[in-house]
Amino acid sequence: MNIIAIMNDLSAYFKEEPLRELHQELEKEGFRIAYPKDRNDLLKLIENNSRLCGVIFDWDKYNLELSAEISELNKLLPIYAFANTYSTLDVNMSDLRLNVRFFEYALGSAQDIATKIRQSTDQYIDTILPPLTKALFKYVKEEKYTVCTPGHMGGTAFDKSPVGSLFYDFFGENTMRSDISISVSELGSLLDHSGPHRDAEEYIARTFNADRSYIVTNGTSTANKIVGMYSSPAGATILIDRNCHKSLTHLMMMSNVVPVYLRPTRNAYGILGGIPQSEFTRASIEEKVKNTPNATWPVHAVVTNSTYDGLFYNTEYIKNTLDVKSIHFDSAWVPYTNFHPIYQGKAGMSGERVPGKIIYETQSTHKLLAAFSQASMIHVKGEINEETFNEAYMMHTSTSPHYGIVASTETAAAMMKGNAGKRLINGSIERAIRFRKEIRRLRTESDGWFFDVWQPDNIDEVACWPLNPRNEWHGFPNIDNDHMYLDPIKVTLLTPGLSPNGTLEEEGIPASIVSKYLDEHGIIVEKTGPYNLLFLFSIGIDKTKALSLLRALTDFKRVYDLNLRVKNVLPSLYNEAPDFYKEMRIQELAQGIHALVKHHNLPDLMYRAFEVLPKLVMTPHDAFQEEVRGNIEPCALDDMLGKVSANMILPYPPGVPVVMPGEMLTKESRPVLSFLQMLCEIGAHYPGFETDIHGVHRDGATGKYMVVVLKQGADEPGDKPSDTVKKAPGKKPSAAKKS
């Protein structure tokens, strides 16, 4: 950070010469000098070059108006105003709050001014650095000798080996030297929440509107388990979104709780539509509890917000309606909701405390903010027992955390403070909306087919767009009013072949083919559905990346319309099975997969597969205990009906479990099996198009798709721990009496 911008006024020698002297002295101090052409050029420079650390301008020419504009972009950026001896400053006390320092045009004073600018720059850097990151930088600069972990000793061990030196050179000196031991007392402790680590957590809590925040260094998968372990004692009942992330299934395998599921909707595209409002009512929960063996009134609830596809809930409704004392919003995909007004009322930390309730929000900082992979946060609003919570925290946290991950989490929060954070998110929203409009324009102008966007017809308003029951674009005919909202930065493109009402067209282009084409051209899709592709317009997306995506999509249309050979369009796919794809053309491939989808009537099958849940025979915890006891056996997927699954079965997409450990597929839930069989059939017919299904594998010898089930008898009464587990205190609730 060493760039100073000078707005040079060449109208008078007595102004030009002092600035020329200052230029020379600033270069001696290690600064680089930029000369913007005009006011707009300067503001663009400030907006686009984050390494700018100061602005110099002539007070007579630019004065307070420019100072205010600079402050709007970066209120902490040092501003240096030069005035001649006879200038009228005309400033009041509120103006002096702007970060302006005044100097007089005078020959021979350049060295002194350059020294003051260096001091102001150092102070600026010190001010913008958050507490732990600042302490870490300071420690690394001190170059202390250590005789403790980690064994690479600031990278010196790597330099003792040829391959180690390559590793060192790739990652760099500061990465090595900042990887330090928890024995460094001046940095405090992540596990004890002391020193700069505690300061960092408090800094994050203020930034994210939380009462308490925790830094998690191994992802939101772990953050979810920490919250769940604290909130759900063994034998208790929890209310959980059936579209939960698999980490919450793992929580239920670790902690012997009884799950009661909130059932979400799904449209013909396979897009998750959220949980209806009726599912959150007391009457609905009473009915679920009554129909679930060993269930009592839930002590904890988990809701995924937003959904993977970018749908937010009206969280105020959930907080005030759901009669559960502890509510956890798994918000892994939306760590930015506190930094733009369109998300108000749609996030866990929105608004004030809810009396008598604890609200948790877990966020993957690394997913859509600027942090290292695995950086995550837990935010809390409400009263918790911090000592007990910390036991759950320590249970899941390494005693050797990577300080780079911790500091990146805090730095991500620092980047989002004030106007700077709002501008970053606003930029993402604007780029996403421009991209959406460009797709619609190209669709209108294209000959024949082109991609469409899953969105309302009118997106001129910068907002989270509501899914109303009177609109058809979203494909959820019975959706509640004022309940679900589409995030503009989650862009879902639609490929030809399927209408919003679930009608399969005569011809279609499965999205998996487009996804493979984009991958060939260096563009990775976030999620690929049957006829839709999800793209995330995070703060790291710029105009170049958006234009590259547009270009690749138009190129795909061209090669598809030309009906080129698969080996020329998708060479990686061709190399997987050259004999199979030798003469095949791209349209034949697309229509072949589309015909399979039509044969199975995918929209109807997908609807039925998620309409009826498998039978709960035992809790996920009990099923896992049977597995570790060895009471399991392999089973062909086709023969799974009537058997208890040992593992979760999770096809990707959509990336949520269709069968939980301890559940049995029955005649009523047969569509779940048919759905899985269809996914496997497509992969068997077309090499390279296998669906990744957690819990299902293909036997190399027989070619059959296999699962793991519990041995017969393992689920008999008396053989499973749940028969002896203590129930949570309290009786089953009735409509007449609150529990």
UniProtKB/Swiss-Prot annotation:
MF (Gene Ontology): arginine decarboxylase activity; lysine decarboxylase activity; pyridoxal phosphate binding
Q: Which keywords does UniProt give here?
A: Cytoplasm, Decarboxylase, Lyase, Pyridoxal phosphate
Q: What class of enzyme is it?
A: lyase
The places in or outside the cell where this protein is found are: Cytoplasm
Family (UniProt): Belongs to the Orn/Lys/Arg decarboxylase class-I family.
User: Its principal location?
Assistant: cytoplasm
Q: According to the UniProt entry, which residues carry N6-(pyridoxal phosphate)lysine?
A: K367
Record-linked SUPFAM superfamilies: Ornithine decarboxylase C-terminal domain, PLP-dependent transferases
Lineage of producing organism: Bacteria, Pseudomonadati, Pseudomonadota, Gammaproteobacteria, Enterobacterales
Q: Which InterPro entries does the UniProt record give? A: OKR_de-COase_N (IPR005308), Orn/lys/arg_de-COase (IPR011193), Orn/Lys/Arg_deCO2ase_major_dom (IPR000310), Prn/Lys/Arg_de-COase_C (IPR008286), Prn/Lys/Arg_de-COase_C_sf (IPR036633), PyrdxlP-dep_Trfase (IPR015424), PyrdxlP-dep_Trfase_major (IPR015421), PyrdxlP-dep_Trfase_small (IPR015422)
The protein, known as: Lysine decarboxylase
Q: What is its EC number?
A: 4.1.1.18
User: What segment(s) does the record annotate as region Disordered?
Assistant: 714-739
GO annotation terms (biological process): arginine catabolic process
> Is this entry keyworded Plastid?
no
Compositional bias, Basic and acidic residues, is annotated for 714-726
Residue stretches of biased makeup (Basic residues): 728-739
Cofactor(s) needed: pyridoxal 5'-phosphate
- UniProt keyword annotation of Cytoplasm present: yes
- Catalytic activity of the protein: L-lysine + H(+) = cadaverine + CO2
Annotated Gene3D superfamilies: 3.40.50.2300, Aspartate Aminotransferase, domain 1, Orn/Lys/Arg decarboxylase, C-terminal domain, Type I PLP-dependent aspartate aminotransferase-like (Major domain)
